[in-house]
Amino acid sequence: VREAALESLGRMDGTPVLVRARGWARRPDALGAAAGQLLACRGSADDGPLVLAALREAVRGTGPDGPALWSLVDGAGRLGIAQAAPVLRHLYRETASSHLRGRTAQALAATDATFARGFAVECLWDCEETTREVGARHAATGDQRVVGRLRRLAADPAEEAEVQTAVRSRIGPDTAAI
């Protein structure tokens, strides 16, 4: 019954439930965790500190692969919580899930001022096409390794269309333009 109640909280919508979630998010229990996830999905920028606290607690409680992390990572990116960048960097490095790594890269692109010179470059070599796409959209091109990798991605007939579109949006039809 408890799990069903917590799941139903995530499906609720509207201002009254957000007001309640803001109060519950500070609780150190399952209701607090569910409230943090709800705020990550539907909250406003003012909810950033609560979402960040929920993200930190989820990492401490379940490690870098916990089920709550997906919505919290997405929320940190959606809300542009710059203070979440260190936690997101940790998750990017430590998660075993390539899909969560891709979502974390997207959140880092929105929260970490150093992303273009750091993790975005690493994203270009990731096994997940969505992560490579994030890297292609954001990696700083001052490094010759990045330029070479972007050219290879653009020329690779086996590369996913979304990745090639992202690369071409950066370099144009003439790959020598970089």
Regions found by a protein language model. Give the residues of each.
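C-terminal, beta-strand-rich globular interaction domains
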Residues: 64, 124-125, 151-158, 162
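Short, 15-30-residue, compositionally biased linear elements
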Residues: 85, 113-114
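Structural detector for internal amphipathic alpha-helices that build alpha-solenoid repeat scaffolds
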Residues: 1-14, 19-26, 30-45, 63-81, ...
